Amino acid sequence: MSRIGKNPVPIPEKVSVEISGLTVKVKGPKGELERVLPDGVSVSQADNAVTVSPSDTSRRSRERHGLCRTLVANMVEGVSKGFSKKLEIIGVGYRAQVKGKKLVVSAGYSHPVEMDAPEGVTFAVENNTLVTVSGADKELVGNEAAKVRGIRPPEPYKGKGIKYQGERILRKAGKTGKK
C-alpha cells in the first residue's frame, strides 16, 4: 500500500467535493476543477476527508493509488489556495507585458511573441521582467509556465533568457582568446 495514498485528503471549509464513480468534482473560492481518475482505484468521502484506496491488489492498482490521492489533493489545494509559478526575464531589452489576456514577450527576436492565456490561467507582470503564471489547476499552470520559459530558455554563457525564479543555471566558461 502506498504511504502517500493511504493518507486521507482533508477538505477545508468553503470547498465541496462531489464523487460519482471515478469522476471527482471540486468547487471552491478559486474555481472549479473536474478530473476522471484512472481505473484501479476507488474514491470515497467521509466526514471532511476524501479517501483513495486501490480497488484490488493488482500491481496496476497499487501503482495508481498514490498518484490518484495526490491528484485529488492538488485539486483541493488549487480551488482553495491556488498555484503560481514565477519566471524571471534576464537580458538587455528583454521584457514582458500583459495586453488583455495575452502575454507579450520581447526576448531578442525580430518580433514580440504573444501567448494567449487558457481558461483558468492568468498572467501578471511586475517590473517588465517578473512574470507570474497563476491558476487553480497545478498541471495547467506548470505547462503554461514551461511554454513561457520555452520562448527563450536561459543560455549557459551569459545567462540570458527566461528562467524560473530560484532556478540555478550552470554557467560555462567562454572561449579563451589566443595569447
UniProtKB/Swiss-Prot annotation:
Indicate yes or no for the key word rRNA-binding: yes
Q: Name one GO molecular function term.
A: rRNA binding
For this protein, the record's PROSITE patterns field holds: RIBOSOMAL_L6_1 (PS00525)
The answer on whether this UniProt entry bears the keyword Membrane reads no
PANTHER family (alphabetical):
60S/50S RIBOSOMAL PROTEIN L6/L9 (PTHR11655), LARGE RIBOSOMAL SUBUNIT PROTEIN UL6M (PTHR11655:SF14)
Name the job this protein performs: This protein binds to the 23S rRNA, and is important in its secondary structure. It is located near the subunit interface in the base of the L7/L12 stalk, and near the tRNA binding site of the peptidyltransferase center.
- Alphabetical list of NCBIfam families matching this protein: L6_bact
Quaternary structure annotation from Swiss-Prot or TrEMBL: Part of the 50S ribosomal subunit.
Q: What is this protein called?
A: Large ribosomal subunit protein uL6
Taxonomic lineage of the native organism: Bacteria, Bacillati, Cyanobacteriota, Cyanophyceae, Synechococcales
